[in-house]
């Protein structure tokens, strides 16, 4: 998984799996720049349940002021499966 800051957005790409979450967990509070308000997920190819929990943690750390932009159909499916539509603010989607 790769995280690339882009102004008020950060782009996540690759796979967000349990292994990646374990590697990133200690840095979660400082992982995103202070001005980041969007997570661009257009190049996030896969997330497992640990990845979804990690995204929830990032949103919680921002007190809900973090939008998931362009989540893939797979990520949208997990959001619906776990009934997280009210938790996550999303915009756009990828095919």
Please state what every model-predicted region is:
Residues 1-50, 57-95:
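STAS-like cytosolic regulatory interaction modules
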């Amino acid at each position: 998984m790769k995280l690339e800051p882009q102004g008020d957005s950060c782009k996540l790409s690759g796979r967000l799996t349990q292994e990646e979450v374990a590697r990133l967990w200690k840095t979660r509070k400082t992982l995103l720049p202070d001005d980041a308000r969007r997570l661009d997920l257009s190049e996030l190819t896969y997330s497992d349940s640990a990845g979804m929990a990690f995204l929830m943690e990032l949103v919680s750390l921002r007190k809900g002021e973090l939008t998931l932009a362009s989540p893939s159909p797979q990520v949208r499916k997990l959001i619906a499966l776990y009934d997280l539509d009210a938790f996550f603010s999303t915009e756009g989607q990828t095919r």
